[in-house]
Amino acid sequence: MAKEKTTLPPTGAGLMRFFDEDTKAVKVTPKGALAIVLVFILIEVLLQIIGPRIFG
């Protein structure tokens, strides 16, 4: 006797979505991310300029 083949349910034509639900995470807009990066750059520049005077 031949073995029966088991078939799996279709997965949406090969496309799978892992994050269908909204996750509970911090949401940052692109403008917010840019602002955070610019603040870090400004802090770095200031530390390069006045850091040696403060930290010896």
From Swiss-Prot:
Primary residence: membrane
Membrane topology: Single-pass membrane protein
Record flagged with keyword Transport: yes
One GO cellular component, as annotated: plasma membrane
Superkingdom of the source species: Archaea
Extracellular topological domain: 50-56
Alphabetically ordered keywords of this record: Cell membrane, Membrane, Protein transport, Translocation, Transmembrane, Transmembrane helix, Transport
Compartments it resides in: Cell membrane
Membrane topology, Cytoplasmic segments: 1-29
InterPro entries (alphabetical): Preprot_translocase_SecG, SecG/Sec61-beta/Sbh
Transmembrane segments annotated in the record for this chain: 30-49
GO terms classed as biological process: protein transport
Protein task: Involved in protein export. The function of the beta subunit is unknown, but it may be involved in stabilization of the trimeric complex.
Quaternary structure note: Component of the protein translocase complex. Heterotrimer consisting of alpha (SecY), beta (SecG) and gamma (SecE) subunits. Can form oligomers of the heterotrimer.
Family, as annotated: Belongs to the SEC61-beta family.
HAMAP family: SecG
Protein name, as recorded: Preprotein translocase subunit SecG
Species this chain originates from: Pyrococcus furiosus (strain ATCC 43587 / DSM 3638 / JCM 8422 / Vc1)
